[in-house]
Amino acid sequence: MMSLSNKSLNQHLPGMAILVMLSCLALFALPATAEPTTRFEHIYTPRGTAHLTIANVNGTIHVSAWDKRTILVRANTAPAVEITEREVGDDILIAVKRSFRVGRADFEINIPADTYLTLKNLMGDIDVQNVTGPISIDSIDSNVRLIGLNSPTVDVKVTSGDILFDGNLHDNGSYSMLAVKGDLDITVPESTPFNLHARTLSGTINLGSFISNLVSGSREPKNISGSYLKGGPQLSLTAYAGRILLHKK
């Protein structure tokens, strides 16, 4: 007959084995998850309206407006990443230096709303919120989200990735968005007139209820142009291999 102590030990063996296995897994996992990072942080104080340029290689760029007149740029980077900065008057250029080892740099940026913004990236999503200044974005592989904008000009070019725009259109403004491979999802106010040119090669164009008030110069399935509510700012949408979706707000 099994003794009480042996029986008790056998009852606890499965639980003890699980604890040992979990401890071993945790030890093996530590080197993989404990990759060191470095921190970049700088505050800029432009005298007038700033022009901020961010040139990244691999990583996200998040920009949001705040009510201060300073610019705060923060980034978490891999140790091998080198960030350079140049400030000439109100022109500020922050760039990730390219090297054979492509390290990651994730930017978090706060700017005055009227800052002129230029963003360049090879790989990594881009997010801009509540900005009122001109915006230029050029990326190879990024999903771009532009939310709450009130900018006079927007120019976005993406080789691979989706573009989402939700904002206002200014009188005499220019809004150009191009994705070689990706969708364009655009939301603009129903009451704002504009001139539209939408084209795609292998995708589809869906203008929703805008189509009923569009005085069209072209109604081809892959190429639609015309004036909405007598026309106004220029809205140019191009998706070579993707959909174009236009929504009212």
Predicted regions and their residues:
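Intrinsically disordered, low-complexity terminal regions
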Residues: 1-249
